[in-house]
């Protein structure tokens, strides 16, 4: 089994780097960070910071780096469950990190472009801010999950699958909150919404999975 020979060094580096990013965020943006921790529990964070729409702020950028970092670590962990032979190396790590970052930033750019084309810049900016906040929250959750899976449960199959359910639940809950906040806009453009889900949410994930699963570089 691949999980039996996986070195934990990369997870130690990921955990320490991620903790440093979170610590820097909390130190520089204490009030913002504390409000952000209640993102799923209530709507205070969105109400307070939604009008600013600063999805390219330093605060979000640091949390975005943390998200990409922990996503790569989680992909390594999940690959052990699927027995996919992902090579653990700096090169592979950087490729995966770049793919995830490029995918997410690319989606943001496309959404901004669509907002400009259809003259819904403000609504699209709000949608992007909500989605980025939701994803960055997932990044925070993945930090303890990854550490527990590696250092406590030692890549246990049940623990990995349970963690996947938890992560998916958080993502779905964040999507529901986003849909509720933009329900009028969605209902008024329902066909475009379905097209958006298929092309910008589901489609790229399938392509990314096939690319990673079939790549000779990973």
Regions found by a protein language model. Name each.
Residues 25, 34, 38, 76-80, ...:
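Membrane-water interface at transmembrane helix exits
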Residues 48-57, 82-89, 120-128, 155-157, ...:
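Membrane-interface helix-boundary motifs at transmembrane edges
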Residues 7-23, 90-103, 160-165:
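Alpha-helical transmembrane segments
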Residues 1-59:
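N-terminal juxtamembrane cytosolic/stromal segments of multi-pass membrane proteins
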Residues 84-151:
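Alpha-helical transmembrane segments with an aromatic anchor "belt"
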Residues 1-14, 66-88:
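Long, highly hydrophobic alpha-helical transmembrane signal-anchor segments
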Residues 143-218:
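Terminal transmembrane helical module of multi-pass membrane proteins
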Residues 17, 60-78, 101-102, 106, ...:
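Hydrophobic alpha-helical transmembrane segments of multi-pass integral membrane proteins
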């Amino acid at each position: 089994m691949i999980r039996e020979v996986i070195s934990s060094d990369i997870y130690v580096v990921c955990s320490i780097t991620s903790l440093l990013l979170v610590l820097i965020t909390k130190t520089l943006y204490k009030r913002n960070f504390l409000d952000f921790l209640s993102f799923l529990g209530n709507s205070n964070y969105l109400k307070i910071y939604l009008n600013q729409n600063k999805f390219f702020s330093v605060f979000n950028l640091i949390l975005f780096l943390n998200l990409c970092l922990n996503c790569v670590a989680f992909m390594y962990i999940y690959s052990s469950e699927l027995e996919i032979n992902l090579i653990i190396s700096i090169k592979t790590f950087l490729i995966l990190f770049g793919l995830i970052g490029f995918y997410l930033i690319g989606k943001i750019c496309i959404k901004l472009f669509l907002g400009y084309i259809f003259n819904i810049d403000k609504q699209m900016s709000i949608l992007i801010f909500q989605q980025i906040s939701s994803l960055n929250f997932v990044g925070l959750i993945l930090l303890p999950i990854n550490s527990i899976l590696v250092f406590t449960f030692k890549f246990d199959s049940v623990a990995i699958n349970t963690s996947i359910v938890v992560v998916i639940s958080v993502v779905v809950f964040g999507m529901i909150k986003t849909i509720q906040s933009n329900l009028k806009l969605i209902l008024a453009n329902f066909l475009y919404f379905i097209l958006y889900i298929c092309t910008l949410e589901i489609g790229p994930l399938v392509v990314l999975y096939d690319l990673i699963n079939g790549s000779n570089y990973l």
